[in-house]
Curated annotation (Swiss-Prot):
Keywords: Hydrolase, Metal-binding, Zinc. Belongs to the DtdA deacylase family. D-aminoacyl-tRNA deacylase with broad substrate specificity. By recycling D-aminoacyl-tRNA to D-amino acids and free tRNA molecules, this enzyme counteracts the toxicity associated with the formation of D-aminoacyl-tRNA entities in vivo. Residues 61-82 are annotated as: Disordered. Its EC number is 3.1.1.96. It catalyses: a D-aminoacyl-tRNA + H2O = a tRNA + a D-alpha-amino acid + H(+); glycyl-tRNA(Ala) + H2O = tRNA(Ala) + glycine + H(+). The lineage of its organism: Archaea, Methanobacteriati, Methanobacteriota, Methanomada group, Methanococci. This is D-aminoacyl-tRNA deacylase.
Length: 254
């Protein structure tokens, strides 16, 4: 798999990650603007786009995350196009999550106190023609500068890329996860239990249009849709299930 590692000069966590990745001999494509404000035309062609990035939240909780970019609604205030999502590689996202968790639990890193989780689809860029993922250090400036946090992600990234390039990973069902909160706790747990390769994730609060449902089921390879049954409003459940049934798309409660 050909891949492009991308770092933004505006992002301190991204620059921290870039330093560590380059220390291992990997090349990084540098951009001058925010990663979320970029688009497909600004990058060389690749089979996978991997953005080295910060994660910000009001809680400032130490968190390491991985997610695919995309806007599930008309709101594109954080880059990208309205109601558009970039393609997703569920194997990459899940192996990356598992590897971050593995390193995070090692004795030399455990005291840092980081959580490891997925995030749902959000922000740009949304028009990429190949799978993409953001790998992130969060959630405040203090964490963005931590070398050991960058080392966890760098080692996880190297292990993930090596596994994919050498086809050294087990065959498992690939799923799309619908429902739950922003950090998708249900699907994070399923992935860490190594039950599935989890790709696209959407939250309870997003009202998914037919346009988005069509993109979810056409831009990622998947075996079935996993529905967090308690993590959706009843009205939305009925709408989504009706769409899946009408289009012969397999789904399961999880």
């Amino acid at each position: 798999m050909d891949y492009l590692l991308i770092s933004s000069e505006t992002d301190p966590a991204s620059q921290n990650l870039k330093k560590h990745v380059e220390n291992y001999g990997y090349s990084v494509f540098n951009i001058e603007k925010k990663s979320t404000q970029t688009n497909y035309s600004e990058f060389p062609q690749s089979e996978m786009y991997i953005f080295l990035s910060k994660h910000a939240s009001e809680s400032k909780k130490p968190t390491l995350t991985v997610h695919t970019p995309g806007n599930l609604t008309d709101d594109n205030s954080h880059g990208g196009n309205p109601e558009e999502i970039s393609p997703c590689n569920p194997v990459f996202n899940t192996l990356m999550l598992q590897n971050m968790n593995k390193y995070n639990e090692m004795e030399e890193y455990k005291e840092l106190g980081f959580d490891v989780s997925f995030e749902v689809l959000h922000h740009g860029p949304t028009d990429l023609k190949a799978p993409s993922a953001f790998v992130e250090i969060g959630s405040s400036e203090e964490q963005w500068q931590i070398d050991d946090a960058a080392e966890i992600i760098t080692n996880s990234l190297i292990d993930t890329l090596n596994s994919i390039q050498n086809s050294e990973y087990d065959e498992k069902e690939k799923i799309i996860g619908i429902g739950g909160g922003h950090y998708s706790p249900k699907f994070t747990k399923l992935a860490l239990r190594e039950e599935y390769y989890v790709g696209y994730l959407t939250p309870k609060h997003a009202k998914l249009s037919e346009n988005i449902l069509n993109q979810l089921t056409s831009k990622q390879e998947f075996d079935f849709i996993g529905i967090d049954w308690k993590g959706l409003y009843g009205e939305d459940k009925r709408k989504y299930v009706e769409f899946f049934d009408e289009n012969d798309i397999s789904w399961q409660r999880v």
